[in-house]
A protein has these predicted regions:
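Conserved thiamine diphosphate
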Residues: 138-188, 212-215
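Aromatic-enriched
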Residues: 2-17, 194-206
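Conformationally flexible catalytic loops at phosphate/diphosphate-handling active centers
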Residues: 67-71, 182-258
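Thiamine diphosphate
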Residues: 8-147, 152, 169, 188-189
Length: 258
């Protein structure tokens, strides 16, 4: 049996086997993220609201993810609450996602440190938007995502709708296998609301690419009375430093995973 070449693999998965649809960037992000999501912690904010809205609609319609389940959507009182929901849900062993932008993303930063520090795989999808200063501005820039650079989240950026579909999947797959959370972002309005004809992912193909052993390993580390474990402890500076340094091997390995 002749092994499939990389070109043949690319041609089979990326060109021949995929259907084409017309959609905007938010819809593309919602489509690909729904596949990997068991719980979505949401709170609407322009211009990312359509992502959460689509996920909510598909959940209500009974759409299944790659695990054969319908996504549980939890709308909180603010983005801070949504991020707390993501953290708690991940700690309980559920693949969890959220969608936000601008000041909403800034409210999530405290929980982002916790999620990254505990090596919990997840993806925050962000339609990057100006952080309001002397006035409100709902249009795109990267002032929100730049504020998150030292949280420990890896960052993936897209420049068009097709990239949102493809690299959005990469963010989820790499987070699962690499145990590092991702902030996946694209320009608010310029990409989030840009309409293009793109090749979409079939959920069966995404399931085939998912490292299910890594998913099961993630679930084994969840909070469970059958497997007692300590979380949220207090550490002095010497031990705290050692534990922070212990994360480095996952970040060093991540480029190869991506």
């Amino acid at each position: 049996m002749i092994l499939e070449t990389k070109f043949e693999y690319f041609r089979r998965y990326f060109i021949l086997a995929r259907k084409f649809k017309t959609m905007d960037g938010n819809t593309a992000a919602a489509h690909v993220s729904y596949a990997f999501t068991e719980v979505a912690g949401i709170y609407p904010i322009t211009p990312s609201s359509p992502m959460a809205d689509y996920v909510d609609q598909w959940s209500a319609a009974g759409r299944k993810n790659i695990f054969g389940d319908t996504v549980k959507v939890v709308e909180m009182q603010s983005e801070a609450g949504a991020a707390g929901t993501v953290h708690g849900s991940l700690a309980a062993g559920a693949m969890t996602t959220t969608y936000t932008a601008s000041q909403g993303l800034l409210l999530m930063i405290p929980n982002m440190y916790k999620i990254a520090g505990e090596l919990l795989p997840c993806v925050f999808h962000v339609s990057a938007r100006t952080v309001s200063a002397q006035a409100l501005n709902i249009f795109g820039d990267h002032s929100d995502v730049y504020a998150c650079r030292q949280t420990g989240f890896a960052m993936m950026c897209e420049t068009n709708v097709q990239e949102v579909m493809d690299l959005g999947a990469v963010a989820h797959l790499a987070s699962i296998e690499g145990r590092v959370p991702f902030l996946n972002f694209f320009d608010g309005f310029r990409t989030s609301h840009e309409i293009q004809k793109i090749a979409i992912w079939d959920y069966e193909d995404l399931k085939e690419m998912t490292n299910m052993e890594a998913v099961e390993e993630f679930r084994k580390h969840s909070l469970n009375p059958e497997r007692p474990a300590m979380r949220g402890s207090h550490e002095n500076d010497d031990i705290f430093f050692q534990h922070r340094e212990a994360c480095n091997k996952y970040y060093n390995a991540l480029p190869a995973v991506v």
